Amino acid sequence: MIVTFVALALSCCTPQVTADCGLRPRLQSAIITGRIVGGEMAKLGEFPWQAAFLYKHVQVCGGTIIDTTWILSAAHCFDPHMYKLQSIKKEDALIRVADLDKTDDTDEGEMTFEVKDIIIHEQYNRQTFDNDIMLIEILGSITYGPTVQPACIPGANDAVADGTKCLISGWGDTQDHVHNRWPDKLQKAQVEVFARAQCLAAYPESTENMICAGLRTGGIDSCQGDSGGPLACPFTENTAQPTFFLQGIVSWGRGCALDGFPGVYTEVRKYSSWIANYTQHLLQDRNADVATFTITGDPCSSNGSIISGSEGDFSSPGFYSGSYTDNLDCKWIIQIPDIGSRIQLSFTEFGVEYHTFCWYDDVKVYSGAVGNIASADAADLLGSHCGMNIPSDLLSDGSSMTVIFHSDYMTHTLGFRAVFHAVSADVSQSGCGGIRELLTDHGEFSSKHYPNYYDADSICECFITAPTGKTIELNFLSFRLAGSDCADNVAIYDGLNSSYPRIIRLCINQGFNVTVPSSSNTMFVSFKTDGQVQDVGFEAYYYFSSNGNSTDDTDYSQCGFSSTPINADQTAARIVNGDIAIAGSWPWQISIRLCDTCNHYCGGSIISPSWIVTAAHCIESSAHITYIRAGDFDRFTIEISETIVPVAQIFIHPDYQKDLPNNADIALLKLANPLSYSSTIRPVCFPSQISTIPEENAECYVTGWGLTEENVMAQKLREAKLPLMPYDQCLNVYTSYVLNENMLCAGNISSGIDTCLGDSGGPFVCRKSRNDPWILYGVSAFGRECGSSRYPGVYTKVTRYIDWIIATANVSTVTSVVEEHDPTEFEQGCIQLLVLSNHEGDLSSPEYPELYGEGMLDCQWKIVLMDRTKSLNINFRFSHSQQDTAAACSLANIRISESYSDGTVGRQYGPYCGSSESILISSLHDLVVSLHNSQSQVKIGLKLEYRLEELEQSGCGQLKHLIENKGNFSSINYPNIYSANSHCEWYLHASIATHYLQISLSQFSLENAYQCRYDFLTVIDVTENGNISHGPYCGNSIPHVITGHGLFHIKFRSDASLNYKGFFASFVELNERPQEESGCGGVKFLNGTNGTFQTAGFPLAYEANLDCTWVIEVEDGYKVRLNFQQFSLESSSSCKYDWAMLYNGEFAFEAQRIDTLCGYDVKLEDIFESTSNVMRIDFHSDFSFNKQGFLAMYTAVSPGSSRSSVHQRENHLQEKRSGGCQDSIFTDEEGVIEYKQGDHTGNTRCLFRILTNHLHVIRLWLRKLSSLNLHENDSIKIYDKIDVDDIYSGVVKPVFQFTGIIGYLDSLPAYLDYNGGEISMLFSSDGQHGDTSFELIYKLMQDKSSTTNPKQLWNDHHGKWPWMVSLFGSSKYYFCSGVIISSRWIATAATCNLRSSEIHIIFPEGTNPKKIWEVEKIVVHPEFKMIYNVPQNDLALIQLVDPIEHIPPVCLPVASNIYSDCHVLKIPRLAGSAAFPDIVRISSVDTLAHDICMREWHLRITDDMLCGRINGTNSCQRDVGGPLVCQSPSDDAWYFVGISSWGPKICNDNTAHHRLPDVYVSVAYFLKWITKIIQ
């Protein structure tokens, strides 16, 4: 394929391109992702045709340069009616070009011209905007340059295609409905051209002279002030370099960036003749030189492309569609005709996945023609580039140059576009592969060959020149020089050459992350090396900055505002696949790092120059957090705006994790150095303590670099708009999590908006309107299932901790916002102080009894209680013009709160709305009554009456109503004998209705009687779903602790005789329900796929007077199946003494009762099943005849394997299973189902179930790898997606069955496939033969065509790998593997994060596989470290306390041996099996040569590593430490060749990542060290 590109085309079907229009010679921009409405700033020279139309020195419109004396714009820009003027004069108009920043008159190429003439189209219609076009002729002539160029004018037939992506630019309104909020800097955006039919659908009034452009979902558009500006579209049919044509002029539209309403543009091609008529020569050929070059071949084929010509351009695949793809290897060989010249290569746009050494994706540039990387001469490498910074220009040594582009298997970005041209051989060269003089406003350069080693005895010099008035800052992104005597060094001078003062000299690794500023506008950099050892060198980034005399007077310390607007509201914006934020739009966002070069770990928010607020859980497990990065946007790029600051101190809230998990999950970081505020580094505001949650109509966002999909962290800062979820709704969602009032929830459970790991500690901010500041309401704490559509994110509520923050961080350094409305918005004079000297009174809202409807209303009355011995009875009627909905209540309501003497707020009541209420308040404090209405269209009214009353008594010497956080109550006369005929009542009130109360009785002695019929105590838990009664209690047994909701009604009665000491009780208010261990007196919550619970004391007799509750919750979509392993309660015909009641759901509703059980009639075969995913079990015992109780087992079952009936009790198992064989459920992707007769006796029936996604096929192996030893009366029956009860009852037939198979495996099929996603296997045996056993292997397949090499499945011969070791934590969780290398030493990987006090070791295939071996000490290789998440020297040795006997060690490798038949070994994790598995998995491995491995992993491989490709799969993290063993043909012995260390980011994917091998530690490399340690 040969494609010839010509800058002038004369085809009737393609645009006529003149040689000097539509080009961007100074282009330095990245891909456009923003918008003008909330848009992204343009770069210098990115829109060289852009002009500004000023009237009386005020910019009112845009325009487009089309010639040296002509500007094209919209006619309505010079229409006096648009400005409500009688007339408008051209003498008051100006044209300005190359104006990037309106506040800076020194923009490169900026020129201002007076207007000579204005020509408005003769048929312009101001009502319809038809023919909205005008020509402006200027006085003088525009001088073209890098930042000033004309746009091309299309011909009459050159219509732009539907769907074409075009660019818009301007200084217009950046936020719709907030007019005159125009930016100072030129904005840009990318839009899509709509089809004519779509345009008419949005605007039926549009004419044929108009086109529409925008986004389908809105959010991107031009706006007021952009009028007259360009819609520039690229023409790329025959050229890789786009030439831009002016296809449209910004004209009109409905709103700005609204969904369904694109912008409307005057279609320029319809006026080409009209333009030519006035400009005459404009469309004629300008007789410019025509540049021609050819491209031969596909760059991504094996041979690559050849580019021939004196100048031209090319780009990476997919560049113009926005992104390259994975797994690319592309090559361009550039050849210029003049063999005496050099090639200068310039990147105009650049965006490649970043790594310090460009290990992932990169662009390599070589001098000369290179066939392939493997054969390339390292000396020819000019540089290897990645990241988002544009590299500086590169120079070849001769007339040819090679560019090689590689991408790995994941994370792709924009790509690049490059231009080249021939230059003279005497062009000044830096010695680093590029030009010597650097003039662009920012750029990147490196030592020659970087990241390969630089040359010996070399000199690299370059000088950087900034415009007058600017200075230069140089930052080293990477720096590593050889030698210890500074013979290799980088010297930096404050001037044009080395004769100027030297700023600094850097050597070894001194330059890493160092920023070097100049004091003038020039800087000279000199890199010199000696003839000894070399290293990788350096990579540097420079930029121009202000010299400190800036006139910017912005107060960046003002909290909650950003200098850059955020993206306009998006529907379903989310961090999980969410919106990329605009750089600088969230200036308080910071990134927490474990080290100055480490990856993002957690988020946080700036609250003052020296303080950061974040989540405590980010800090507790990472004591080495030492740095924060502020002003960051792209994690992979060192940006001008960002700064790294060390952390001096960490403060975790003292209540963190107190009482419940995730409580008080908040922490403060004090910085070692204060931050300097700027446009990208600013503080966020605090809410007032009164406003605990955002207002109903506030817009709220969460930001961060969290996971965009499972395990993929965002490269650029993302934002998501989240709705606040009501607390009670959040409680209903998180039924198995404990929440409290210190938390708030946000997210949309219907659309899956959420944050993920990595966003932890980040801000949840809200604002009331676009003119208001952003306020920090939440700190990202936790959630369930990243991006789940069912669970919102949970945030620490900041208002709960403001006092602590201010006290810790010093009130003078923290900015806070008290949310107050503009006083002019509300009714005045509605504040009143009421001193209650009379016993009763009233108050009312303005104009009562009429509803107040003249605007928003905020009223406040303070009621001062003069008589503290009385209670206040309040009755009020609150009228509301809207229905009583949660939304309406949040807008208009009444609240009552206690006011303490120190000015703080105590217990709060409300909000109340749309109802009549009667409240009895027993308070010793003053009260504040607040009436609030925040919407003018809502009418409200209030009438409140109050009356002082004597405090009501309980009858036992205390008040009847107890409203304290904690307290006591007791029987009358306690501790003396209580009175006869006592009648006492108490109401215990929680201060907040959603809190819980807990009662503990420390003394208890009442008359004992059957059913407590004489003296008794009853506790009633009053809930909105019904009352829950505890008791009655009597006798001398102290009842268990009782926990309930926010209101307890307590009754004590005594009869006329036999009075005792009585009782003493304490109560306390809790923020959340505690987890009861026994379930007695409260609720024990259980979850998971299976589990057990039992009555207290089981198998001994339970206690008297128990009330126990268990609530079981399993995953949504599953049901709870329950059976009792043992059951023994007191028996009665109606179960009226001791009983167990089973309910559907969390509450004990009679209509949801499944059954009531007692006595001995519950059998093992009885099955009880819920209709939903929640089941409740209540257990009660009376005062006598206590039995053994019960042991219950529950299992989560899918609806497809369960019955629909509520009560399963009649579905008995037909035969009792014996021998201790229990049902097992397998959910892993692969596993082994095994049985050994020696573990069981007698008749045995075992059920094994494999449950998986219905999209999977379950493959069951029956041959070769299977072990079947079944006798005549032994059988295995396989059922495909059949109800378990039907299997046991025998009402269905199996789909496959085999029996009596001993040594006849070849008669069976190789494997069986089942499509249902669920199979059950019923094994039956009479137990007569002691050698009955079997092993069956299964694996989940995507479809039936999937194939798997059997070598990667479980090994079928135990004992073959006796030296294989499993490493378990103290909780018996398997985390790593290892291998025995001597009688007391085990080798494994250092990345296992070993701690001797927490490791237990077993040998799965040893003589005693269950024995646990203790650890004496651990020796980690002294040079073990992580370099950019890649482990180096990943080896550790474990010494055992006792020597290993009867197990030979593995053979260590011999250097002279040649190995074949290599395998990696692994200990599997099997569901339903013992905690310590006794089986080893084996997978065959094809080892790779070291150079191939280096190329595959792109230089990440070091000499201590080996590579191998596992047949059919990859290792996962749980394989770490496992051995790579190979057999020697000479002696058939197995040799320990490698240790599983690391590999692809995503495992078990046989397609996308097949090119990348796994990486192992080379044991041979460390033989000397190993020998030294173990000897």
UniProtKB/Swiss-Prot annotation:
Positions annotated as active site in the UniProt record: 76, 132, 227, 617, 665, 760
EC id: 3.4.21.-
Gene Ontology BP, a term: oogenesis
SUPFAM superfamilies: Spermadhesin, CUB domain, Trypsin-like serine proteases
Location in or out of the cell: Secreted
InterPro entries the record matches: CUB_dom (IPR000859), Peptidase_S1_PA (IPR009003), Peptidase_S1_PA_chymotrypsin (IPR043504), Peptidase_S1A (IPR001314), Sperma_CUB_dom_sf (IPR035914), Trypsin_dom (IPR001254), TRYPSIN_HIS (IPR018114), TRYPSIN_SER (IPR033116)
Tissue: Expressed in the testis and ovary. Expressed in the gonads and gametes. Expressed in the follicle cells covering the vitelline coat of ovarian egg.
Residues that carry a glycan: 277, 303, 497, 513, 549, 748, 810, 968, 1027, 1087, 1090, 1273, 1511
Molecular function GO terms recorded: serine-type endopeptidase activity
Ranges where the CUB domain occurs: 300-423, 432-545, 830-949, 956-1070, 1080-1197, 1221-1341
Sequence ranges assigned to domain Peptidase S1 in this UniProt record: 36-280, 575-810, 1314-1575
Signal sequence residues: 1-19
Cysteines engaged in disulfide bonds, as pairs: 61-77, 166-233, 199-212, 223-256, 300-330, 358-386, 432-460, 486-507, 602-618, 700-766, 730-745, 756-786, 830-859, 889-913, 956-984, 1012-1034, 1080-1108, 1135-1158, 1221-1246, 1376-1392, 1493-1507
GO cellular component: extracellular region
Keywords: Disulfide bond, Glycoprotein, Hydrolase, Protease, Repeat, Secreted, Serine protease, Signal
Chain's role: May be responsible for elevation of the vitelline coat at the late developmental stage of oogenesis and during fertilization in ovarian eggs.
Family per record: Belongs to the peptidase S1 family.
Name of the protein in its database record: Ovochymase
Biological source species: Halocynthia roretzi
